[in-house]
Amino acid sequence: MKSKAKVAIIGPGNIGTDLMIKVMRHGTHIEMGAMIGVDPKSDGLARAQRMGVAISSDGIDGLLALDVFKEIDIVFDATSAGAHKRHNDVLQAHGVQVIDLTPAAIGPYVIPAINLESENAPNMNMVTCGGQATIPMVAAISRVTKVHYAEIVASISSKSAGPGTRANIDEFTETTRKAIEQLGGASRGKAIIILNPAEPPLIMRDTVFALSDPADQGKIEDSIAQMVASVQAYVPGYRLKQKVQFDVITADKPLNVPGVGLKHGLKTSVFLEVEGAAHYLPSYAGNLDIMTSAALACGDMMARRRMAAGIARGHKEAV
């Protein structure tokens, strides 16, 4: 026998709808309790209602008014960085844990392959799609040697970027940069996002450049391979696009690193692609898949801990 805690999702857009389907199909310790939006004509709300999930188009106030709210343990916020602060304040007052899929970053950054088991804050931030894909590679290099500078470029299909993503571009780059440093271990980070308008849409592709102290290239390759396997455990479509590349930067020909200055050492280049599971959008939307898969893993962990501690607000027994 195992228990399942009820969760709600605020934001029935691309990310919220994909996450709802993942929770319903693959949630180990969680189940859907409610889907919340602000547009009564939202496709995501209509889909949730057809799937038997309680809905409200009255935002956070609508969630509080639902009968099921008293049973909700965890809320996933897939709205915007601007809206998230109020949502979090309201939910914390009711003892509900929050998983933040916006770049608001009120709580600690969480990337399952790096620190899922070590974090259990009232609010946990899932960084960004680009961060979920690339920061594990920076962390893998940091396990072997000191990383002075890491730069990531996330290229996603324009079709997979909804209004929330587009409204949060500045927050995306800043949040990802900070997480490159805090979770990736780089002294300095930089993040770039590209919305690719190509037709047919291309799957998510990511590039990671890291400048580190000299190190055994074989050990770095092994560390990267292990980290790729860790991410694939919850995002099967995550993979290396090609062999890891190395360039030795000599002291007589140093690189001028932004914010760091002249540096020599080892430059490591990692090329990734992320194919989505096509739960809601087509497989090219790997950027959504890696975010929602990471959030699902985080939600399952949160629920398991809440029930083990006896603080779950409401859950049911399930086979």
UniProtKB/Swiss-Prot annotation:
Keyword tags: Aromatic hydrocarbons catabolism, NAD, Oxidoreductase
Annotated catalysed reactions: acetaldehyde + NAD(+) + CoA = acetyl-CoA + NADH + H(+)
Enzyme nomenclature, EC number: 1.2.1.10
Tree of life domain: Bacteria
Active site: C129
Keyword set includes NAD: yes
One Pfam family cited in the UniProt record for this chain: Semialdhyde_dh
InterPro entries linked to this entry: Acetaldehyde_dehydrogenase, Acetylaldehyde_DH_C, NAD(P)-bd_dom_sf, Semialdehyde_DH_NAD-bd
GO molecular function, a single term: NAD binding
Binding site for NAD(+): S160, A161, G162, P163, G164, T165, R166, A167, N168, N287
Gene Ontology terms describing biological process: catabolic process
Entry's family note: Belongs to the acetaldehyde dehydrogenase family.
UniProt-recorded name of the protein: Acetaldehyde dehydrogenase 1
